[in-house]
Regions:
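Short loop/edge segments at beta-strand edges and connector loops
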Residues: 104
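STAS-typified acidic loop motif
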Residues: 2-37, 56
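Amphipathic alpha-helical interaction surfaces in cytosolic regulatory modules
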Residues: 26-100
Length: 104
């Protein structure tokens, strides 16, 4: 698991072409590039599905949501899992629940 000052993340490519990204802590403009850089090589291999586990994410700013939307243009099936209530409301208010397939 990689770590910055306030964020930890893990990137795992599954044999079924599913890319699993787990993010915890605080994801914002100060550390978004570390996550984007770590995931980029796996996205180049064209995964069929991307699952982003955010159950332990305490904070995400608009740069996080922008990154996830950018990933959604590259991967046909993307899901945010274990989305905290506040983040769920933000994603819904932006009209992105279909694009990001938010799940509990």
């Amino acid at each position: 698991m990689a770590k910055t000052a306030d964020m930890r993340f893990d990137v795992v490519e599954g044999e079924d072409r599913t890319l699993n990204v787990t993010v915890s802590g605080e994801l914002d403009i100060t550390n978004i590039d570390a996550l984007a850089s770590a995931v980029a090589p796996a996205l180049e291999r064209k995964p069929a599905r991307l699952v982003i586990e955010v159950g332990d994410l305490r904070f995400a700013d608009s740069s996080a949501i922008a990154l996830w939307v950018r990933w959604a243009t590259a991967v046909p099936d993307i899901e945010l899992r274990h989305v905290p209530p506040l983040l769920r409301r933000v994603v819904a208010s932006m009209g992105l629940t279909e694009t990001l397939k938010v799940s509990s």
